[in-house]
A protein has these predicted regions:
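Ubiquitin system architectures
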Residues: 1-79
Length: 79
């Protein structure tokens, strides 16, 4: 679909492949990943591109703001 994107969220616990709306906010991707991997609520998590591990995404922006493409690998890590 034109308004959806397939994303691979990679953590120390493995990789989760999921389809999101391009308008999905980063914090909602983090929340879904937290639930999928059963990560603790108190963990302060951030999302970034695999190629740019030091450029964390703003949690209030959407996937489309970062031009995330189908099949892209995003890293979920502790801040």
């Amino acid at each position: 679909m034109a308004n959806q994107v397939l994303v691979n969220v990679k953590t120390s616990k493995g990789t989760w492949e999921n389809t999101f709306q391009k308008s999905t906010r980063i914090k909602d991707v983090i929340l879904g990943s937290r639930m999928h991997f059963r990560l603790p609520k108190e963990a302060n998590l951030v999302l970034c591109r695999q190629e740019l591990p030091h450029a964390d995404f703003d949690p209030d922006r959407a996937l489309v703001n970062y031009n995330v493409i189908d099949g892209e690998v995003l890293i979920l890590k502790e801040a």
